[in-house]
C-alpha cells in the first residue's frame, strides 16, 4: 500500500515543497495544539449538529458539510492565517501568480456507513480549461478528530499529479491520510484524492478544509456572499485581504461605489470599503512599459 510522508511541525516550507513536488501530498503532524482543536470544535459544533447531509454520492448521503467558515468561526479565521501553510502556499503557487487567495472553506464530517468518494482532481472545478502546466491550488485538510482508514481518512494517490489524466490507480497506489487531531494534510489541485469510506460503527471523522488558489481565478466558494461586507468589516484586515477584499496585480478586483455621488470611491481597491480615507486608486499606471511587458508570459 502507498503511504504519505509525515513531516514534523518544525519542518521548513522548503522541506514541505520538496515532498509536494514528488508526491503532491504531505502530512504535517501536530501543526496546531489541542487548545486550538478544541476551539474549532466549539465553533463548528452548533452547525454540524444539524442534518446538513450531502445530496448525492459525491457529497455523501452520510456526510455533513458546512461552509462560510470565515464568517462563522474565529478559530477558522486564525487557522486560515497559519504561517507555515501560508508560506508554503505562497512559494508553491508563485510561479503562476503574483498573489493567492482563500478559495474554499468547509467543515466535513463523514459518518459511519459512508461509502468512499470517487477519486478526483480539485482543479476540475474550472472545467479542465487550465493548462496542465499551471498548478492552481494548494489545499489543506485539518484533522479536528483523528483520521483513520476505518473512519474515512482521505484517500490520496501520491505522485498522480504527474500521471496521464486517464490513468486509473491500482489499490496499492492509494494512500490514506491517517493523522491525529491538530495535524494537516497539504495537497495540490492536480493530485487524485477523495473522501474515504467510514466502516466504523460510531466514529465520526471531522476535518476543516481550507483551499488556497491563484488570485486571478474565480473562487469555488463565493467569499463576498459567504462573508459579505457587513460581516467582513469586523474581521481582521489580513483575513479580509486573503478572502478577496484586496486587489490582485494592478487592477484585478477594483470597485466603484454606486452610492457615492461625489465619485470619491471610483475605481478603487476593495480595501477602501473599510477605511474612512481613500488610500489607493487604479487611475495611475506608474510604469506602463513594464505592465505591457508582463502581460504575456
Mark where each language-model region is.
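Conserved double-stranded beta-helix
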Residues: 167-186, 191, 196-297
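A structural signal for short, well-ordered beta-strand segments
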Residues: 104-107, 140-142, 208-212
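Non-heme Fe(II)-dependent double-stranded beta-helix
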Residues: 2-22, 29-119, 123-129
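A structural signal for short, well-ordered beta-strand segments and their strand-loop junctions
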Residues: 27, 101-103, 155-156, 186-187
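Short Ser/Thr-interspersed hydrophobic loop/turn segments at strand-loop and sheet-helix junctions
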Residues: 108, 146-147, 190-191
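Catalytic core of non-heme Fe(II) oxygenases with the double-stranded beta-helix
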Residues: 113-179, 206, 217-227
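Catalytic palm active-site di-aspartate
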Residues: 24-25, 182
Amino acid at each position: 500500500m502507498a503511504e504519505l510522508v509525515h513531516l514534523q511541525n518544525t519542518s521548513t516550507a522548503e522541506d514541505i515543497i520538496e515532498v509536494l513536488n514528488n508526491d503532491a501530498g504531505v502530512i504535517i503532524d501536530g501543526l496546531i495544539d489541542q487548545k486550538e482543536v478544541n476551539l474549532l470544535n466549539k465553533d463548528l459544533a452548533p452547525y454540524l449538529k444539524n442534518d446538513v447531509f450531502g445530496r448525492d454520492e459525491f457529497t455523501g448521503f452520510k456526510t455533513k458539510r458546512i461552509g462560510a467558515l470565515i464568517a462563522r468561526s474565529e478559530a477558522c479565521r486564525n487557522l486560515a492565517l497559519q504561517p507555515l501553510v501560508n508560506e508554503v502556499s505562497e512559494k508553491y503557487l508563485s510561479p503562476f501568480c503574483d498573489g493567492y487567495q482563500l478559495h474554499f472553506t468547509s467543515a466535513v464530517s463523514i459518518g459511519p456507513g459512508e461509502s468512499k468518494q470517487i477519486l478526483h482532481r480539485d482543479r476540475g472545478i474550472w472545467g479542465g480549461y487550465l493548462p496542465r502546466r499551471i498548478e492552481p491550488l494548494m489545499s489543506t485538510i485539518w484533522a479536528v478528530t483523528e483520521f483513520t482508514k476505518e473512519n474515512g481518512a482521505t484517500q490520496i494517490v501520491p505522485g498522480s499529479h504527474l500521471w496521464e489524466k486517464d490513468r486509473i490507480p491500482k489499490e496499492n497506489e492509494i494512500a490514506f491520510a491517517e493523522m491525529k487531531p491538530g495535524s494537516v494534510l497539504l495537497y495540490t489541485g492536480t493530485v487524485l484524492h477523495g473522501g474515504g469510506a467510514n466502516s466504523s460503527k460510531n466514529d465520526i471523522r471531522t476535518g476543516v478544509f481550507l483551499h488556497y488558489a491563484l488570485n486571478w481565478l474565480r473562487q469555488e466558494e463565493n467569499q463576498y456572499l459567504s462573508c459579505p461586507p457587513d460581516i467582513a468589516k469586523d474581521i481582521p484586515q489580513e483575513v479580509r485581504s486573503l478572502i478577496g477584499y484586496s486587489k490582485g496585480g494592478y487592477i484585478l478586483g477594483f470597485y466603484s461605489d454606486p452610492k457615492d455621488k461625489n465619485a470619491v470611491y471610483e475605481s478603487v481597491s476593495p480595501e477602501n470599503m473599510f477605511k474612512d480615507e481613500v488610500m489607493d486608486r487604479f487611475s495611475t499606471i506608474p510604469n506602463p512599459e513594464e505592465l505591457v511587458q508582463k502581460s504575456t508570459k
